[in-house]
């Protein structure tokens, strides 16, 4: 796996493929893999198991299937100690429900809640949003370079994770240096319509 090293803080950077990273080639993730490495993998940091799963589809067809990912995910989670906190990264949100079930066409499914899932971290919506779905947090962050599609300011999220997999989250805003902007909605015209 090719992880970039943030030389200032000496921290690894792990990449997660998104829909626009699936580009023309022998298979959609070919370029991504040549630069960053595999599109699904896991690692441990402290007492927490982190899982990166690929976007199911995108601008071009991937070489992997939901069956491939599901089989791999089942195998990966079968090898962690029971009760280990799990955080999953995927470019898109898996579900709006309280139960996070990864489904495949022919390889069955896996209920991630049964593996002490703490958070599902995604970015496809390009908004700053965090919601508790049952016992699991879904966490989305806007685009670093242009902000959110909901006009939220460009930011990146810092998550501090403890040994139990519980976390705090803070947004750090970019391109702002003692800057404030106050917006005031326009009033109603004498005719009663908005300008």
Regions found by a protein language model. Give the residues of each.
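A short C-terminal boundary segment appended to hydrolase-like catalytic domains
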Residues: 160-195
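Active-site His/acidic residue clusters
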Residues: 98-102
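Short, catalytically relevant binding-site loops at active-site mouths
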Residues: 58, 93-96, 127, 176
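Proline-rich low-complexity regions
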Residues: 12, 93, 185-186
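Short, well-ordered beta-to-alpha junction loops that form the rim of enzyme active sites
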Residues: 55, 89-93, 124
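Extended active-site neighborhood of metal-dependent phosphoesterases/phosphodiesterases
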Residues: 1-85, 105-119, 127-163, 167-170
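Short acidic, glycine-rich surface-loop motifs adjacent to enzyme active sites
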Residues: 79-97
């Amino acid at each position: 796996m090719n992880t970039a090293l943030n030389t200032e803080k000496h921290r690894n950077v792990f990449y997660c493929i998104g829909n626009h990273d699936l580009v023309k080639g022998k298979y959609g993730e070919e370029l991504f893999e040549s630069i960053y490495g595999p599109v699904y993998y896991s690692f441990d940091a402290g007492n927490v198991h982190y899982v990166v799963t690929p976007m199911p589809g995108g601008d071009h067809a991937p070489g992997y299937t939901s069956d491939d990912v599901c089989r791999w995910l089942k195998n990966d989670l079968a090898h962690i100690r029971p009760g280990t906190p799990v955080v999953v990264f995927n470019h898109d949100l898996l579900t709006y429900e309280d139960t996070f079930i990864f489904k495949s066409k022919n390889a069955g499914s896996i209920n991630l809640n049964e593996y002490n899932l703490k958070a599902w971290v995604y970015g496809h919506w390009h908004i700053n949003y965090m919601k508790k779905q049952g016992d699991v947090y879904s966490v989305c962050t806007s685009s670093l370079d242009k902000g959110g599609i909901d006009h939220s300011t460009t930011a990146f999220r810092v998550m501090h994770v403890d040994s139990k997999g519980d976390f705090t989250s803070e947004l750090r805003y970019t391109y702002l240096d003692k800057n404030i902007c106050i917006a005031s909605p326009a009033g109603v015209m004498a005719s009663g319509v908005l300008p």
